[in-house]
Design a protein with these regions (language model features):
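Flexible "stalk/tail and boundary" regions
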Residues: 43, 59-61, 81-82, 99-101, ...
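A short loop-to-beta-strand structural motif that recurs across blades of beta-propeller domains
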Residues: 55-57, 94-96, 147-150, 190-192, ...
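Short, solvent-exposed loop/turn segments at conserved positions within beta-propeller repeat blades
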Residues: 51-52, 90-91, 140-147, 186-187, ...
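A short beta-strand motif characteristic of beta-propeller blades
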Residues: 25-30, 63-69, 105-113, 158-163, ...
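Short loop/turn segments immediately following beta-strands, especially the blade-tip
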Residues: 194-201, 294-300
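Hydrophobic alpha-helical segments and helix pairs
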Residues: 102-159
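Beta-rich, blade/repeat-based domains predominating
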Residues: 30-45, 51, 70-89, 94, ...
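Beta-propeller domains
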Residues: 47-66
């Protein structure tokens, strides 16, 4: 068993070296971020959140500055929506809408039936002007499984729970075919695929990939290891931030590993793409996720 495991790891390593043109450079954008998450390339600049500081930071290509702060938010993700910006506030269980200047326009506290959110975590565009977002539930492997996915209509007026009983729903992305939504089920160590109906609701779910089947485990993994951010890249591949393994797994549409991006931080949280598509990859991660002040860093890989 051990010999076969080493052989598989070597085969995957060779695959990663041969699979694509290597990254030529790595830049540390912010070496002292406080649990960074949710990177978003927008209007020629990078925005990202600091979860443990409830900040949004901005990098203009030269320097980092504070864009927005709200005590108690626990900012976890960002997405553009109707010319504005949505912020997932994990700690306050809300979604905040900001205008282009960072002014708060509204705070969304419940879905259209009056149900509150449990830990808004990440966003994905639905391809028709609306937004999906995950509400993770409790980050505890022994807690009841209450993770959900919600949908915000294109006009921003209707918010509907479209999936539930997910073991800590986390990153999500529209699939390449536009007919499926991929959702990270973090505490189950896998990525789910949901059928998307014409009205944006979600139907049948299947297991799209188990991380243990994509790549061999790393020595320091624990029970909380799993997929965090998930993004469909401009190159048609899926980028999966593996929290707890210091890496981003890159898989094709057939769920075959294309390459591994090794990251200095153990707790890799999310991915975004810059002005040159898959040739500019932003990655956020934390060195420590169990003890304040939760130090982390923001990186840029270029080809």
């Amino acid at each position: 068993m051990q010999a076969r495991g080493h052989a598989r790891a070597l085969a995957i390593c060779l695959l990663c070296m041969a699979g694509a043109r290597a990254f030529a450079g790595q830049l540390t954008i912010d070496p002292a971020a406080h649990y960074p998450e949710g990177p978003l390339w927008i209007d020629g600049q990078l925005l990202y959140v600091e979860y443990s500081a409830s900040n949004i930071k901005r990098w203009d290509g030269k320097r980092v500055s504070l864009y927005w702060h709200k005590d108690g938010c626990g900012a976890n993700a960002l997405i553009r929506f109707r010319g504005h910006l949505l912020v997932a506030c994990y700690d306050s269980n809300t979604v905040v809408e900001l205008d282009a200047s960072g002014k708060e326009l509204r705070v969304i506290r419940t879905d259209s039936r009056g149900k509150t959110f449990a830990g808004p975590n990440d966003f994905a565009a639905d391809g028709h002007g609306g937004i999906y977002f995950s509400a993770s539930g409790v980050y505890d492997i022994k807690a009841p499984i209450t993770g959900a996915v919600l949908h915000i209509s294109a006009d921003g007026l209707t918010i509907t729970e479209v999936a539930n009983t997910i073991h800590y729903s986390n990153g999500l992305t529209l699939a390449k075919d536009g007919r499926h939504l991929l959702v990270a089920e973090m505490l189950a160590g896998r990525v789910l695929s949901f059928d998307i109906a014409a009205d944006g609701t979600l139907g049948a779910r299947t297991v799209w990939a188990r991380l243990q089947d994509l790549a061999p485990p790393t020595p320091h993994e624990d029970a909380y290891n799993g997929p965090d951010g998930v993004k469909l890249g401009p190159d048609g591949n899926y980028y999966i931030a593996q929290n707890g393994s210091s890496r981003v797994l890159v898989a094709d549409e057939n769920r075959k590993l294309v390459r591994i991006i090794q990251v200095p931080t153990p707790y890799v949280t999310n991915i975004a793409f810059g002005p040159r598509g898959a040739d500019t990859v932003f990655v956020t991660g934390a060195f420590e996720q169990w003890k304040a002040p939760f130090p982390g860093a923001v990186y840029l890989w270029t080809r």
